[in-house]
């Protein structure tokens, strides 16, 4: 169907989050209630997906993927961690802004769905479906893990900032055992969260491919 076809286009383009998505949600093959409903669903999907990709681009621009880069941290340590502190501050701002946008967009979309010029049966189906998908959506699950990841990053930075360490054989060598144990425990938790994120992405890809 047209809806699945357009969904596939959005999904495929979304895989490259570095480039804005370009999909026309209108299609001459659609008419009546189904046309209005399909265009609304696709527009909502497109806005959400593009907002997510913009959020990822914003994080990349802040060098967030290099947060635990040992060479960067060794250099920044000499500057009292000014770069890392600013990075964390900026990342928190991006994450909080994205969270607010997601919530606002969802509320607006449900309100708009209730006013669509389609039969009441379709309207009820659409709003119920949107409310149900809100919590199970891949981006929602991923974002929750990313928020947990940021909290761990705050904690691991405090361990680095408040204790003596140096780079040795490309690893963080602490002068005392307690901070080393703290660092290792937090690092394992971050790796576990990253692994969960990859699993969610793989599972979602599988689900979408099966649907299409």
Give residue spans per PLM region.
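Leu/Val/Ala/Ile-rich N-terminal alpha-helices, chiefly Sec-type signal peptides and the beginnings
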Residues: 1-81, 85
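Amphipathic alpha-helical coiled-coil segments
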Residues: 48, 95, 146, 190-193, ...
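A cross-kingdom marker for long, charged
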Residues: 165-212
């Amino acid at each position: 169907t047209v809806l699945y076809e357009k969904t596939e286009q959005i999904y495929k383009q979304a895989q490259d989050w570095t480039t804005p998505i370009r999909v026309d949600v209108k299609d001459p093959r659609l008419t009546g209630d189904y046309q209005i409903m399909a265009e609304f669903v696709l527009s909502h999907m497109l806005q959400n997906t593009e907002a997510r990709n913009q959020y990822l681009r914003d994080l990349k621009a802040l060098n967030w993927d290099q947060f635990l880069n040992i060479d960067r941290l060794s250099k920044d340590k000499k500057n009292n961690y000014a770069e890392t502190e600013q990075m964390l501050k900026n990342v928190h701002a991006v994450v909080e802004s994205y969270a607010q946008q997601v919530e606002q967009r969802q509320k607006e979309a449900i309100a708009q769905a209730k006013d669509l010029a389609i039969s009441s049966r379709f309207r009820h189906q659409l709003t119920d479906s949107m409310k149900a998908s809100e919590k199970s959506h891949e981006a929602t699950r991923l974002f929750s893990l990313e928020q947990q990841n940021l909290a761990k990053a705050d904690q691991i930075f405090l361990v680095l900032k408040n204790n003596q360490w140096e780079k040795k054989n490309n690893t963080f060598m602490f002068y005392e055992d307690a901070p080393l144990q703290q660092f290792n425990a937090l690092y394992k938790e971050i790796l576990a969260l990253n692994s969960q994120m990859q699993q969610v992405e793989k599972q979602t890809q599988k689900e979408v491919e099966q649907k299409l």
